Amino acid sequence: MDRNDRRIARFTMLGHATFHLYELTIPLFVVVWLEAFDVSAAVLGTVVAVGYALIGIGALPSGALADSYGSKRLVVLSMAGMGGGFVLIAVAPSLPLLAVALVLWGAAASLYHPAGLSLITRGSERQGTVLAYHGVAGNVGTAVGPLVAALLLTFLDWRLVAGLFAVPAALAILVAGRLEFVERTATDPDESTATDADGLSAIVAQSRVLFVGSFLLVFAIAVLAGTYYRGLFTFLPDVLAGLPVFEPVEIAGETFEPSQYAYAGLLLVGAAGQYTGGRLSDSRSPERTIVAVFIALIVVSLSFPVVTSFGLFATVAICALLGFFVFMEAPIHQALIGEYVAADVQGLSFGYTYLGVFGIGAAGASIAGIALTYGGTALLFVALAALPTGGLVLATILLVRSRRPSP
């Protein structure tokens, strides 16, 4: 990587770590909220799904803004809004107001991915490698956030813990503000097509172009992956807490939940998956790689309820495999966008992608809650396995198309 690549990597690593620090800490709070607000998993899952949906709904305008005005300001604004959103969560006195706070958090979080990822695909020379480091940082956030939350929730009230989580965003903003880089490569157009026409009409025209090519398949793959991701992680802490091998342990008068640390460890293993997926995107066909990842996810998902009954070591192993492969997919489909979409509309394409991943994909939280409520863990993982199965079909079509000779 050259100097500009390294600075873009550092900047987006900060933003990505901040995003996932908050995003996957919320499921740990879900365990507490089930009791604090006296609601069922189905109801709370739907409330959380609404908040997560805003990440997707706001992604489309964020992508268009990134094409027109650049990414740096949007990423910094996103980090500030996410920190502020957790302050609002901390003071929410009822379930409806908690839902409002989650919506506001989701709106701020929606700014990150289209802005940050289009910065990488447009501004860096070694896109796959930068995406790999970007993904690793995201998984560090996903692991550190839940781990710190688990420790703090052991000793402190959940409202105080939520308020303290505003501090990481403030620190990230201070560091990010000191990084300077060139957002677009010299080979990109000086002006994006988003600035050549009136805003809405330009977006409509660009969207028509996007959805007549292979991007439609890439978009559908991302939607299925996002639904799987949200369905899995919203209630995974609750699923792990119900396993006999992770029964609570009392140490020095304090009760510790081993399942929370297993959850954090699973997310940390995901960093290796992100890095592997990103590096393979530079050296191998991303179409072939994503096919292999979906096959692995199907096998691991269907095996999970069975393998976790075989004891501690088997449970830890299947959790590690789950974490590795679910996160390996993300940098690969991001690289596919860089491959199939023109540079001047990549912000818009990432906007649509994360509208699908976090907007439509937010339904995964509700699906998971319903499956757990009415069918338990076995039904949950059967339902989840259907999603990478659909992704496998679409990815295979994309692979076949990519191998056809150009006319």
Model-derived features: positions:
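Cytoplasmic helix-loop-helix junction between adjacent transmembrane helices
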Residues: 101-140
